[in-house]
Amino acid sequence: MRRREFVAGGIALAAGKAAFPARSLAQPAPPRIDHIIDAHCHLFIAADLPIEGFARKIMVPRSAQTSDLVARFVDYPGALEALVHAIAVQVKRAAPDMQTEIDTIDEFERDPRRKPTSAWRQDRDRQHLRSAFRLIWFSWDVFSDRPLSLTEGIALEVALEQIRLFLYQLIHEEFGKPDLTAEDREALGGLTPFQVDAIADELYSRDDLLGRYIRWALLYTRNRYELAEELDQLHGKVGQKSRIVLMTPAIVDFSKWLEDEDQLSIEEQVEVMARIACRRDGPRVHGFVGFDPLRQALYDHHRRKPGDKDPMAIVRRAIEVDRILVGNSTKTTGGFVGVKLYPPMGFQPTDNKHLPDDRFNEPAYLRSPDMGLGSQIGSKLDAALAKLYTWCRVNNVPIMAHTSHSFGPTTDYEDRADPTFWARVLKQDAFPRLRINLAHFGHFNKAVQYARPASYVDKCWEWTVGKVITGSSDAYAYADISSLGEILKTGPSRKIVECMKAFKEHFPNSDERLLYGTDWSMIAQEERFPRLLSPKPFPDVMIFFLRAVGYNDTQIERIMFGNAVRFLGLSKAEHEKFGENSTRARLEKFYAAHNLSSDWMRVFD
């Protein structure tokens, strides 16, 4: 089962039942863990992402056989491309710019009473959706960020006409009328703005696939600070106190692979996240900065645009605490705890020297000796990665790597996330103690398709991950169980429990190497996600699952909190062992530079 196939079992939870074997229901209540670290989450907004490139190269091809909406454009490929561009433009227009975000964060910090409620945020989401629908019906010409040619204008009009028909037909199907008559189609063009608003409200509140995706997409129009507040609520409270002590949201950088630059550069995203890191209450937010070896290789070999910055310099500025001169004023750098890598976009964690090969077809410009990297793409990617690994090892900086067979341009590209490559990295003399989190563990894709999945777990990537993370007692190799939505489905959860039990039996010390994570806000797109919040906080669902696997209370507490303390280097012992080259020392220096108390970190000692 793939990473994103989530949460049907949420309905069982809403009924007061859990999607685990009946025997587990007789067990004692899971332990109440009030100190939690979310080691894998995201707070990105639309301006942070290459939405158009991601949709065009990954989402649309994957949806061609399953999406009714995409199927409407089989005969209109130009219209579908126009639609993707139009949606990307509008979502990014709705997202706040960097200075607006920072000003809003400052306002919330000055007066916490001004923080918006969930009801207020949902009402604003509806307003955004109504505005978008009114544009679709009445002002389609604003759906572009540039003047359109006649051909482009016709393609966009065809695209929006198909969208109008699709949305209107959905409303009719709700009332048992699957086909539109000629009169219906005529009425479609005569709707009033208030009728269009009603369609928007209806679709926003629906619990079907489109409704979920609409609500999820609208999250990307919010402020990052608000997304952090939502993640806090997902974990529940102890009185008024947050259960989640620390969240470590990851920035992703893969726009060079998709040929679609982010609206906010990585450097600008770092600046906003560093401001959130200065919050005075609630869970602390210290992120992972995105690093792309392709961007580094292009920079190192002078394939850059005016104003481009050295990616490694951006990484260092995000993590190292220093005072730098910016214009006529000084600024404090730092606030991040690690680096995020995303191999399935096109690179392996090591051994890329064979690239380009017959399977390497994206992006095409890389083969050019003038614009790209010519025939030495692979060796230059390896050099960029070695530069990152060396710096991270010397400074005890953790790396989070996407290690799931998902969300690459092709299946071959997704193979490049294989944990076998990380085993090779850690066997190199230079990197045996590199801090690495192999993210998205626990799906057992090659085993759950069988009736007796436990017999096939050694064929799964998870088996390789087990060897990597338990191979040495003094290493810093871990795996997070973020985005493990199968645990909420009755059938899949039983299979995952079986696989995890077999894994636990073979790797008895695995509890010392697993990390808890949510993959927020990605999980918000999943089936019946809103119902998940009603019966119990998300971490309690994960705790219940771990108990069903057979982990005891002490082991579960390690997974939910203690292991992340060691992986991230947050304890006083880490400070004493590595001195200024420890995360604990860097964060204490960061808080002191901002005249903030670091007493909250005592919970790690």
Regions found by a protein language model. Name each.
Residues 36-46, 400-404, 438-441:
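Histidine-centered catalytic micro-motifs
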Residues 24-27, 433-605:
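H/E-rich (His + Asp/Glu) clusters that bind or coordinate divalent metals
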Residues 150-237:
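Long, low-complexity, polar/charged, intrinsically disordered or flexibly structured peripheral segments
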